[in-house]
Amino acid sequence: PYKAVCTHGWVVDGEGKTMHKSLGNGIEPKEIYDKNGADILRLWVASSDYHSDIRISKPILAQLSEAYKKIRNTARYILGNLSNQGGFDLDKDGVAYESMEELDKWAIMRLDNLIDKVNEAYNAFDFHIVFHAIHNFCVVDMSNFYLDIIKDRLYCEKPDSAIRRSTQTAMYRILSAISRLVAPILSFTADEIWSYMNHCASENPESVFLNCLLYTSD
């Protein structure tokens, strides 16, 4: 028994041709997760628009592996800056939204937009929109803009300065949200990120899956 079901088109090769053993154009799932890991296989499924035929090839998987690295590297950078110089405890060091720096408020605003878009996409079973939204957020909003601008705060300000704590508060909320939002797709990666976080009292540190997955900022 199930409440909903998705159907999809044929899985075809990179050129759109039907896979046949005689053509040698098939790819075994085991070959993918042995080489790239299970999360890359899950990401391929999620990134595909299942309303039409779904293409798979080694170049497509290579592109997805690079996209995956962007998301993972964003999480790793944030984790590093929440754990260095004595670490960051949201319950003790967190800054209230109204007292945060304007740039950090902007980051939270962009995060809220992402949460709304991803929640809407999950509810509509548009998993490819989930992937593209999270990837664009990590690359465009975070890596190319926000995380680049805040480097001086993180590396030059005193560890417990108000401006640095403001940034760390935003980073914590971003990391917590991203972990939850990607968990249905990048399950192993999300749980690994979660295991390294110094969690606030309202979160269950045991597993990301023991928390509300479709996270809201309220």
PLM feature segments, named:
Residues 3-7, 207-210:
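Beta-strand segments within the central parallel beta-sheet cores of soluble alpha/beta enzyme folds
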Residues 5, 16, 71, 142, ...:
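Hydrophobic, well-ordered secondary-structure elements that form the walls
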Residues 10-97, 199-204, 208:
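Catalytic adenosine-cofactor/nucleotide-binding cores of aminoacyl-tRNA synthetases and other
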Residues 67-76, 105-113, 132-152:
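Core structural elements
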Residues 122-129:
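Short helix-adjacent coil turns
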